[in-house]
């Protein structure tokens, strides 16, 4: 095995391990928020996605080396945030005829997500 191959394998193992940490943290944050707030709206998923957008914006603002960005961005933040759960919860709100909540979930997630990413980048650059 060459040094380059060994480094690539180490990075991918790191992404898997750090991704595991990100997914466990997502579970803990989601459940903690969901326990404290109304169950009719997916506040837990909203919380992880907004904080994840802020963190990814922050990491992007740092201009990390490629391997560090892969570990932190793809590994941790990619596992911490969840597009698929956001879509499923929005679809379920629609199924339950909670159209205002479904639309609010989309609009609030996109607007706050963009704002959080911009804020994260700004913080990294000061």
Swiss-Prot record:
- Topological category with respect to the lipid bilayer: Multi-pass membrane protein
The known regulators of its activity are described as:
Na(+) is not transported, but it plays an essential structural role and its presence is essential for fluoride channel function.
Task: Give residues annotated as binding Na(+).
Answer: 78, 81
Q: Which UniProt keywords apply?
A: Cell membrane, Ion channel, Ion transport, Membrane, Metal-binding, Sodium, Transmembrane, Transmembrane helix, Transport
The UniProt record lists the keyword Metal-binding: yes
Compartmental location: Cell membrane
Question: Could you tell me what this protein does?
Answer: Fluoride-specific ion channel. Important for reducing fluoride concentration in the cell, thus reducing its toxicity.
Q: Which family does it belong to?
A: Belongs to the fluoride channel Fluc/FEX (TC 1.A.43) family.
Name of the molecule in the record: Fluoride-specific ion channel FluC 2
Q: Provide the species name.
A: Mycobacterium tuberculosis (strain ATCC 25618 / H37Rv)
Task: Tell me the gene name.
Answer: fluC2
